[in-house]
Amino acid sequence: MLSVAMGYVIAAFYRFVHLHNYYDMKPVILEFCLSRGIKGTVILAEQGINATIAGSRQSIGEFFSFLDSDDRLRGMKYHESHSDREPFAKMKVRLKREVVRLGIDGFDCSLRGEYIDPRDWDEFVSSPDVHVIDTRNDYEVRLGRFKGAIDPGTSSFREFPEWARNWALDKERDTCVAMYCTGGIRCEKSTAFMRSLGFRNVYHLRGGILNYLETVRGDDSLWEGECFVFDDRIAVDRNVSPSEDIKCIKCAGEVDASDLRSVSKGNIMCWDCRLQA
């Protein structure tokens, strides 16, 4: 077991790429990770890969060298963060119809919008002509978002297409749209969907919120609050460190680390409120 003193390296990554043999890839990836003490979740689909894993510095390095043996996954870029506590309880490799589930067919997810570098994001979205859309779920948005961003109020990514169609009803197709999410994959797929609706000026934050927080330092940025993450850290602060300021959604009291480890889908409640729920 990795010592707490050493800490854990957390790597989040994705790539939209045709993986015709993704079924065969599952046991190979799972065996590799288990043999090196790597834990987390890897999602495989015909349209690509999406994952967040954690382990020692050496094991994570070996994992990406392992991916390099596949031409389709070579040179994978990933977002790195760190934690003193183990972020995942087990290693899972899941086979899915979509690498991130939007729930619809009929559009090419490779026809994404244009990237905006984190260093240029604040200036770009400050224009009154830019509509900034948060593509995350409502329980994520509650913890933090970019100032002035539109919250679709969706409880899952599958609800986004219906919201987007309704939002688009009274919008000109040359409307400028900027989208963001946690690590980049949902907003990237969302831009492809918006383009399928006819929007021409569609942009998204490169690497998502996590990359932004790593790149743009200081209290004068447009980011407000904490960033929800899908592991036992639950949320990270502006320094991409595990948040120590998470509040119970029912009583607004402080939630400690032992409470956080049992949280799912943003149901962030202290022990007393969970007993009463």
UniProtKB/Swiss-Prot annotation:
Active site as annotated: 181 (cysteine persulfide intermediate)
GO-annotated biological processes: tRNA modification
Tagged with keyword Transmembrane helix: no
CDD domains named among the record's database cross-references: RHOD_YceA
One Pfam family per UniProt: Rhodanese
PROSITE patterns the record matches: RHODANESE_3
Ribonucleoprotein recorded as keyword: no
Entries under InterPro entries matching the protein: Rhodanese-like_dom, Rhodanese-like_dom_sf, TrhO, TRHO_N
The enzyme's E.C. designation: 1.14.-.-
Function: Catalyzes oxygen-dependent 5-hydroxyuridine (ho5U) modification at position 34 in tRNAs.
Protein name per its UniProtKB record: tRNA uridine(34) hydroxylase
